């Protein structure tokens, strides 16, 4: 959405921010969970192959949730639903128009692909910058977070990623 229609996203976020900041603490909590529920429900309905205004709404909800959830985390449950709880912030900056506009400019000639990380080499050349940020391996028996998505990022995935990094390094 930032790439295709930054101004509509800015306008939508501005409306949400103005509404949200006028709410009491209790009303903010209720509004957060309402948006989280809508976000989780609507993500199943969006056709990500064909751009339409639903992308703007989904993107504005995502940014709103990120800016108002606990510690700005992104996490989903086993059903793939965003499940980070409400964060109690007094005056959150829900969006930064200048940042959105700049990101839109930078993404203008960018191709974004969603898929398995192993396919990224098919799209690289000597000017490509690759950045990987997998979940950390648990460091204790009580620590079990291994995924930002419904699929686990286990030891086998860590090994696959390490092998890919070696391949990228050797390629130059």
Which role fits each region the language model picked out?
Residues 1-108:
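Class I S-adenosyl-L-methionine-dependent methyltransferase module
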Residues 1, 63, 67-70, 115-117, ...:
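Conserved proline-anchored active-site loop of SAM-dependent methyltransferases
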Residues 96-111, 162-172:
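A structural motif corresponding to the C-terminal end of an alpha-helix
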Residues 58, 112-115, 160:
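Short, well-structured alpha-helical interface segments that form or flank functional binding sites
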Residues 106-117, 153:
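Adenosine-cofactor binding site in Rossmann-like domains, unifying the SAM/SAH pocket
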Residues 118-122, 159-162:
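Amphipathic, non-transmembrane alpha-helical secondary structure
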Residues 78, 127-128, 144-147:
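Short, glycine/charged-enriched secondary-structure capping and boundary segments
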Residues 137-171:
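SAM-dependent methyltransferase catalytic-core segment centered on the flexible catalytic loop
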């Amino acid at each position: 959405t930032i790439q295709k229609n930054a101004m509509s996203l800015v306008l939508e976020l501005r409306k949400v921010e103005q509404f949200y900041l006028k709410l009491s603490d209790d009303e903010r909590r209720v509004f957060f969970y309402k948006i989280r529920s809508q976000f989780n429900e609507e993500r199943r309905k969006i056709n990500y192959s064909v751009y339409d205004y639903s992308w703007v709404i989904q993107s504005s909800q995502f940014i709103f949730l990120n800016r108002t959830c606990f510690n700005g985390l992104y996490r989903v449950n086993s059903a793939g639903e965003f499940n980070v709880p409400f964060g109690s912030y007094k005056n959150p900056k829900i969006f930064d128009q200048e940042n959105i506009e700049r990101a839109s400019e930078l993404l203008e000639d960018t191709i974004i692909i969603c898929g398995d990380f192993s396919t990224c080499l098919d799209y690289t050349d000597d000017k490509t910058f690759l950045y990987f940020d997998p979940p950390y391996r648990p460091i204790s028996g009580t620590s079990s977070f291994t995924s930002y998505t419904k699929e686990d990022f286990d030891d086998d995935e860590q090994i696959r990623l390490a092998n890919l990094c070696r391949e990228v390094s050797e390629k130059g």
